[in-house]
Regions:
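N-terminal helix-cap/turn-to-beta initiation motif at the start of protein domains
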Residues: 4-20, 46
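Glycine-rich, aromatic-bearing surface loops/beta-hairpins
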Residues: 118-136
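Central antiparallel beta-sheet cores of small beta-barrel/beta-sandwich binding domains
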Residues: 24-112, 116-118
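Amphipathic, well-ordered alpha-helical segments in soluble domains
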Residues: 17-20, 98, 126
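Solvent-exposed, flexible loop/coil residues
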Residues: 15-17, 31, 121
């Protein structure tokens, strides 16, 4: 079995996110229309069942944003995520092969007005890289 096959058959976020990471992604409307492109540069740390992701987003229009996720690694193999601008219940899901997705709501400033947005975040893991698709 190849390394990639082993990774996908026993995929764990805490084994993938080790140290520094980079990801490219897009934000799309529910109809698939592209809204923005972004790049995420981050650092990860795993301690006592919690994966911490420190993320720095750079958008194609030059805007920069930061977010820290605390992701609990639960005994049933699922993950539950927390961040400061989360609204409502935390996202929770299991990874499947090389895909991890979850839905959540964040309160974010849009033209300096706080707005609650619903996201579906799909992370595709391939060749030691990540592609993100965020759908509003």
């Amino acid at each position: 079995m190849s390394t990639a096959e082993t990774l996908y058959n026993d995929f764990r976020l805490e084994n993938f996110f080790v140290g520094d990471f980079v990801s490219d992604g897009i934000i799309v409307k529910p109809n698939g229309k592209l809204i923005r492109r972004f790049k995420v540069e981050g650092q990860s740390n795993f301690k006592k069942g919690t994966l911490t992701l420190n993320e720095r987003f750079t958008y194609d229009d030059g805007e920069v944003d930061k977010r820290v996720w605390q992701i609990l690694c639960l005994p049933d193999g699922s993950y539950e995520g927390y961040t400061t601008d989360l609204v409502g219940p935390p996202p929770r899901n299991h990874p499947t092969e090389n895909l991890f997705s979850w839905s959540y709501r964040l309160k974010l400033p849009v033209k300096n007005i706080p707005v609650t947005l619903r996201f579906t975040d799909m992370m595709h893991f391939h060749n030691n890289a990540i592609s993100n698709v965020l759908s509003l």
